[in-house]
Amino acid sequence: MCAALGDGHGGEAFYRWFAERSSAEQVTRDIESIPAAQTRMDQWEAQILARVMHKAECIFVTGEENRELIETMHMRWAPNVDAALCMAKERLGADASVTVIPDGVGVIVREGEA
């Protein structure tokens, strides 16, 4: 992911879902234990991000001033796209593919489609 985070991390409750837990797996376990009628603030955003983090390692490209925030949320920080691609290639190998999603809110990604 790439973002300047000019407005910070978004909702405080969203941030706390990750900052107060040891992993994305713990976020998922805690969310799954909440009855549907007792859904908490920003729960759905945390649930979606945790689901993504189960499937993929999230590398977040943003300024150094946001590094601690990103790492507290259990993602890897990178200072630029080149560094993020190097991290991904180290983990997945030189033949790994990259998916570019220009607008995360306006794009639906389906696995196995190009």
Where are the regions that the model predicts?
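C-terminal non-catalytic interaction/assembly regions of soluble proteins
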Residues: 1-114
